[in-house]
Swiss-Prot record:
Designated gene of the protein: pcaF
GO biological process, one term: phenylacetate catabolic process
Active site residues per record: 91, 357, 387
Annotated function: Catalyzes thiolytic cleavage of beta-ketoadipyl-CoA to succinyl-CoA and acetyl-CoA.
PROSITE patterns reported for this sequence: THIOLASE_1 (PS00098), THIOLASE_2 (PS00737), THIOLASE_3 (PS00099)
Listed pathway(s): Aromatic compound metabolism; beta-ketoadipate pathway; acetyl-CoA and succinyl-CoA from 3-oxoadipate: step 2/2
Keywords per UniProt: Acyltransferase, Aromatic hydrocarbons catabolism, Transferase
Entry protein name: Beta-ketoadipyl-CoA thiolase
Enzyme nomenclature, EC number: 2.3.1.174
Keyword Transferase: yes
Transferase among keywords: yes
C-alpha cells in the first residue's frame, strides 16, 4: 500500500536570459541557492534526517559534472551525511527528480527528500572527444548548450537527428498547426507572464540570487526572459528557423536560459516529526515514448497514461502547466487532449516561451508554479507536463491540501 507524499515547500531562482545576469554563476552554486533557502525557511527540520537530494540536470558536460546534486547540497550547508543524486531525462530532469522522490517516499524507503533541478545553459561548454586512434585528426568540437552531440551513427540512420526546431516544425506539419496560431499562442504566454510579474505573482516562489562583483554585489530578483510588450506584428516579422515554408521562429519557441528550483517532499510521519506544513500531495507521475522526430507530442501519451492510472479526466484539473518548448507542440498537445488553445487553466502566468526553459530546472518549475497557482486561485488539482528530447513525455499531478 503506497503512502501519501506531500510537497511542503517549493522555491526557485529567477530565470536568467542566455548570457544574462545568472551567466556569472556556476550551476552548482546556482543549485545551492534554492537548497539553502529551503533550509532557512524551515528551521524546525532536522536536516540530518534528510534521506536524499534529487536534482535534475540535462547537460553535465561542464561545471555541472560529477554529480551536481552532491556538490550543491554541500555548498548549501546541508550535513555531509546527506546523500545526493543527479538525474537526467533531458528537459524533464527536474520533474523526474520530483517523481523519483515521490516514489521512494510512497513505497516507504524514504521519509524526507528534496527534489528539483538546475541548468546553466549560458555556461554550457564546448567539448571535443578523443581520437579513435593514436595521432588521429579531424576531431569535432561540440557545443553542449542544447541538442544532439556525439551522435551514434546507428541512431542517425534509424531515427534521424532532427534538431529541436525541426522536430517542432515536424509537429506543426503533422498536426496542422499554423504559423498564425503559434504566434498567437506565444503572444498569450508573453502577456500572461507580464501580468503575473506586474502583480507580483512570482515573488512568492522566487528567492533572489546574489552576484558578487568587484564593484559590489548585485541582487537578481526577477525573471529576465519575458517580453510583455511583444506584439503579433513583431512576431509575424520573424523569419522561420528552418526555411521560408516553415513556421517555427525564435518568437514562438522557448528560450535558452539559466535557473534552479527545489521542493521539500515528505511522508505524513515526516511532516509531523519536523513540524512541516503540507501544501499539496503528489498524486502520481507517468512517462511515455514517441517518435524522436515529433518529440514535442510526448505529453499526450504521458498525460493519458497518468489520467488512466488516477482514474481522472483532463477537466478534473484546475491548472495545467504545459512546458512551452515550442508553440507548435504546445498547441498540438492541447488539441489532442481536448483543451482549448486559449484555456485560462493552461499556463495562466505564462510559460516557457515567455519565462524561459533552463532544461534541468523547468520540470521542477512547472510543478512549483502549479502549486502556487492552486493556492492563489483556490483550485484543487494541478497537472504539469512536458515533452522530452529524443521522443518522450512526462506528466505529474498534484492536489492541494
Amino acid at each position: 500500500m503506497s503512502r501519501e507524499v506531500f510537497i511542503c515547500d517549493a522555491v526557485r531562482t529567477p530565470i536568467g536570459r542566455f548570457g544574462g545576469s545568472l551567466s556569472a554563476v556556476r550551476a552548482d552554486d546556482l543549485a545551492a541557492v534554492p537548497l539553502k533557502a529551503l533550509v532557512e525557511r524551515n528551521p524546525g527540520v532536522d536536516w540530518s534526517a534528510l534521506d536524499e537530494v534529487f536534482l535534475g540536470c540535462a547537460n553535465q558536460a561542464g561545471e555541472d559534472n560529477r554529480n551536481v546534486a552532491r556538490m550543491a547540497l554541500l555548498l548549501a550547508g546541508l550535513p555531509e551525511s546527506v546523500p545526493g543524486v543527479t538525474l537526467n531525462r533531458l528537459c524533464a530532469s527536474g520533474m523526474d527528480a520530483i517523481g523519483t522522490a515521490f516514489r521512494a517516499i510512497a513505497c516507504g524507503e524514504m521519509e524526507l527528500a528534496i527534489a528539483g533541478g538546475v541548468e546553466s545553459m549560458s555556461r554550457a561548454p564546448y567539448v571535443m572527444g578523443k581520437a579513435d586512434s593514436a595521432f588521429g585528426r579531424g576531431q569535432k568540437i561540440e557545443d553542449t548548450t542544447i541538442g544532439w552531440r556525439f551522435v551514434n551513427p546507428l541512431m542517425k540512420e534509424q531515427y534521424g537527428i532532427d534538431p529541436m526546431p525541426q522536430t517542432a516544425d515536424n509537429v506543426a506539419d503533422d498536426y496542422r498547426v499554423s504559423r498564425a496560431d503559434q504566434d498567437a499562442f506565444a503572444l498569450r504566454s508573453q502577456q500572461r507572464a507580464g501580468r503575473a510579474q506586474e502583480a507580483g505573482f512570482f515573488a512568492e516562489e522566487i528567492v533572489p540570487v546574489t552576484i558578487r562583483g568587484r564593484k559590489g554585489d548585485t541582487l537578481v530578483e526577477h525573471d529576465e526572459h519575458p517580453r510583455p510588450d511583444t506584439t503579433l506584428e513583431a512576431l509575424a516579422r520573424l523569419k522561420p528557423v528552418n526555411g521560408p515554408e516553415k513556421t517555427v521562429t525564435a518568437g514562438n519557441a522557448s528560450g535558452v536560459n539559466d535557473g534552479a528550483a527545489a521542493l521539500v517532499l515528505a511522508s505524513a510521519e515526516a511532516v509531523e516529526k519536523h513540524g512541516l506544513t503540507p501544501r499539496a500531495r503528489v498524486l502520481g507521475m507517468a512517462s511515455a515514448g514517441v517518435a524522436p522526430r515529433i518529440m514535442g507530442i510526448g505529453p499526450v501519451p504521458a498525460v493519458r497514461k497518468l489520467l488512466r492510472r488516477l482514474d481522472l479526466a483532463i477537466d478534473a484539473f484546475d491548472v495545467i502547466e504545459l512546458n512551452e518548448a515550442f508553440a507548435s507542440q504546445g498547441l498540438a498537445c492541447l488539441r489532442e487532449l481536448g483543451v482549448a488553445d486559449d484555456s485560462e487553466k493552461v499556463n495562466p502566468n505564462g510559460g516557457a516561451i515567455a519565462l524561459g526553459h533552463p532544461l534541468g530546472m523547468s520540470g521542477a518549475r512547472l510543478v512549483l508554479t502549479a502549486l502556487h497557482q492552486l493556492e492563489k486561485s483556490g483550485g484543487r488539482r494541478g497537472l504539469a507536463t512536458m515533452c522530452v528530447g529524443v521522443g518522450q513525455g512526462l506528466a505529474l499531478a498534484i492536489e492541494r491540501v
